[in-house]
């Protein structure tokens, strides 16, 4: 669900700028959630996605994404749904997502957890980008060495 961050202007993940009050999008095929960003808030979504809106005083979007993507309690509930699914392609539907329960700590703790999750994802993608840059520089050096002999 998460894509490589290119620039602040192309922040499709919402890592730099989330759209406060806009909620999240759930990919029903991959069973992954991502907060809406300023860049994605007005985009049309297909039937493979579900747009979720919620009261920001009760549920933090990044906390929701953390619970949906990484939480064991969510995973157990989603796996129960998959066990009854005989399709070769496992896909969530609106009804199954609506039946999933979430345990909510107070909003301050949600915001803290959501903020840490957001930062961890940002760090991961920055590190992946750095590793790609190092690999590309190494390959370019090897090509130049190859030309010299």
List the model feature ranges, each with a label.
Residues 61-65, 93-132:
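Amphipathic alpha-helical segments
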Residues 126-149:
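Short amphipathic coiled-coil heptad-repeat segments
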Residues 5, 23-50, 78-79:
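Short, ligand-facing micro-motifs at secondary-structure edges
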Residues 7, 12-13, 51, 140-143, ...:
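Charge-rich amphipathic alpha-helical interaction elements
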Residues 11, 31-34, 41-42, 55-58, ...:
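Short, charged/polar surface micro-motifs in flexible loops or helix N-caps
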Residues 1-21:
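Sequence-specific dsDNA recognition surfaces
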Residues 50-102:
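Basic, amphipathic alpha-helical recognition segments used for DNA target recognition
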